[in-house]
Amino acid sequence: MGYKTKLAAICLPVAGMLFAMTAQAATTLDTVKERGRLICGASQGTPGFGAPDDNGYWRGLDIETCRAVAVAVLGDKDAVDFVPLSGQQRIPALQTGEIDILPRTLTWTLQRDANGINFTQPNYYEYTGFMMPKSLGITQVEDMAGASVCVQTGSTTEVVVNDVSTKHKLDLQPVVFDNTSAARQAFFSGRCDALITDAGALASVRASMAKNPDDYIIFPATPYVDALTPAVRQGDDQWMDIVRWSIQALIAAESFGITRENVDAMLGV
């Protein structure tokens, strides 16, 4: 099967879902189409995943996920409004209908899956990590006894700190913050020995906020790999399918080397 056939096998069902949803008056699609905008939950600034550039234009992996859905539903990648949300705010915002889709570096967990949201298709796999100043001489979890850790409340990393501390008998001291920005600023101001979050986000923070990125080390908090996965509300399975297959189309396009510059030539248009 050639790449055109494979890509068509992915994209054509999305078009079919859109037609079926129009006929069945599915709530989320109707709301988005009537509004003419897709409302997407975003981070409060994580370069590489979701952050505005110097001109205020949002960029990043999660941002492009939302734009792909906007193209599928509205035919316009810029018909998206991005709502910055903290770890505590993001899931309630989806549950209450404040947003239509939630990428925002969201880890797929059983507890979340059972609380009114459905996960679609992972768009990034990574581990949870610690970042610490190299000057402390710590390079692995087992050496962190008594360390203070900046952590954002409402995130899976809050649980990881407690689990790691118990498992290795480290007596870690969580310093909890309501939002990502406050946790990061506290870490770089020296209030905590370590900062915990997804490793990709740590690399982004180190590159964008550290005066000298080489002064900091990142290492795994656990041996497990997390699936960061955009989520939608439960009870709207066809909307979930549209989001899922929009992401699949992005993955397929990347594997075939299809870009905005060569898409017409690659598809023979």
Model-derived features: positions:
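Acidic, polar ligand-binding/catalytic clefts
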Residues: 67, 71, 75, 79-143, ...
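Extended ligand-binding regions for polar small-molecule ligands
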Residues: 64-67, 71-73, 135-137, 142, ...
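Bacterial N-terminal signal peptides that target proteins for export
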Residues: 1-14
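Extracytoplasmic small-molecule ligand-binding "clamshell" domains
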Residues: 25-103
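Sec-exported extracytoplasmic/periplasmic mature domains
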Residues: 33-34, 70-78, 95-99, 107, ...
